Amino acid sequence: MRLILLGPPGAGKGTQAGLLTKKHGIPQLSTGDMLRAAVAQQSEIGKRAKAVMDAGQLVSDEIVNQIVSERIDAPDCANGFILDGYPRTVPQAQALSQMLSGKGLKLDAVIELKVDENALVKRMESRVAETIAKGGQVRSDDNPEAFRKRLVEYREKTAPLSSYYAGTGELRVINGMAPVEEVTAEIERILVPA
């Protein structure tokens, strides 16, 4: 199973990816985790990424695409993977399609978790309150103003992926506002049609 989960910050992509990973035994591939691992391993591409990040710049699509390509080749991805935070742009999606095709692979589905943005802000606020109540650390960008900026960035940069994947016929849209169990069940129905 090769899957992309789309949706704005706070839509529940990480929650769903975690549940699917546990059930199907395939890895969740997070761009941030892959970048950090490449830097820690001091691979050639990791060194290039580190130099860019140390300069306070965004890592180029070329570097991110190469890191993703290398990660997909790892043995634990032989039976599939769930991409989280990649692709973020249409050019990255096009590169992913070419990359997978070159490996003789294709995506099984691109699932978009459709959510109401105002409800997302409330969801974020309650997640912060729960984290604080449990004595946990809160992300510096987990406040309404920063969260709304992340939503705007998502709309501008990542939301066009919906149109792109609708055009390829791979997009499936589900209600991300439903309870977690219902969202999971709907994803399973898409992945394993009756």
Curated annotation (Swiss-Prot):
<feature type="binding site">
    <location>
        <position position="178"/>
    </location>
    <ligand>
        <name>ATP</name>
    </ligand>
</feature>
<protein>
    <recommendedName>
        <fullName>Adenylate kinase</fullName>
        <ecNumber>2.7.4.3</ecNumber>
    </recommendedName>
</protein>
<dbReference type="GO" id="GO:0044209">
    <property type="term" value="P:AMP salvage"/>
</dbReference>
<dbReference type="InterPro" id="IPR033690">
    <property type="entry name" value="Adenylat_kinase_CS"/>
</dbReference>
<keyword id="KW-0418">Kinase</keyword>
<dbReference type="Pfam" id="PF00406">
    <property type="entry name" value="ADK"/>
</dbReference>
<keyword id="KW-0547">Nucleotide-binding</keyword>
<keyword id="KW-0963">Cytoplasm</keyword>
<feature type="binding site">
    <location>
        <position position="127"/>
    </location>
    <ligand>
        <name>ATP</name>
    </ligand>
</feature>
<feature type="binding site">
    <location>
        <position position="36"/>
    </location>
    <ligand>
        <name>AMP</name>
    </ligand>
</feature>
<feature type="binding site">
    <location>
        <position position="139"/>
    </location>
    <ligand>
        <name>AMP</name>
    </ligand>
</feature>
<feature type="binding site">
    <location>
        <position position="150"/>
    </location>
    <ligand>
        <name>AMP</name>
    </ligand>
</feature>
<feature type="binding site">
    <location>
        <begin position="85"/>
        <end position="88"/>
    </location>
    <ligand>
        <name>AMP</name>
    </ligand>
</feature>
<feature type="region of interest" description="NMP">
    <location>
        <begin position="30"/>
        <end position="59"/>
    </location>
</feature>
<feature type="binding site">
    <location>
        <position position="31"/>
    </location>
    <ligand>
        <name>AMP</name>
    </ligand>
</feature>
<dbReference type="GO" id="GO:0005737">
    <property type="term" value="C:cytoplasm"/>
</dbReference>
<keyword id="KW-0067">ATP-binding</keyword>
<dbReference type="InterPro" id="IPR000850">
    <property type="entry name" value="Adenylat/UMP-CMP_kin"/>
</dbReference>
<feature type="binding site">
    <location>
        <position position="92"/>
    </location>
    <ligand>
        <name>AMP</name>
    </ligand>
</feature>
<dbReference type="InterPro" id="IPR006259">
    <property type="entry name" value="Adenyl_kin_sub"/>
</dbReference>
<dbReference type="GO" id="GO:0004017">
    <property type="term" value="F:adenylate kinase activity"/>
</dbReference>
<feature type="binding site">
    <location>
        <begin position="57"/>
        <end position="59"/>
    </location>
    <ligand>
        <name>AMP</name>
    </ligand>
</feature>
<keyword id="KW-0808">Transferase</keyword>
<keyword id="KW-0545">Nucleotide biosynthesis</keyword>
<dbReference type="GO" id="GO:0005524">
    <property type="term" value="F:ATP binding"/>
</dbReference>
<comment type="pathway">
    <text>Purine metabolism; AMP biosynthesis via salvage pathway; AMP from ADP: step 1/1.</text>
</comment>
<comment type="similarity">
    <text>Belongs to the adenylate kinase family.</text>
</comment>
<comment type="function">
    <text>Catalyzes the reversible transfer of the terminal phosphate group between ATP and AMP. Plays an important role in cellular energy homeostasis and in adenine nucleotide metabolism.</text>
</comment>
<comment type="subunit">
    <text>Monomer.</text>
</comment>
<feature type="binding site">
    <location>
        <begin position="10"/>
        <end position="15"/>
    </location>
    <ligand>
        <name>ATP</name>
    </ligand>
</feature>
<feature type="region of interest" description="LID">
    <location>
        <begin position="126"/>
        <end position="142"/>
    </location>
</feature>
<dbReference type="InterPro" id="IPR027417">
    <property type="entry name" value="P-loop_NTPase"/>
</dbReference>
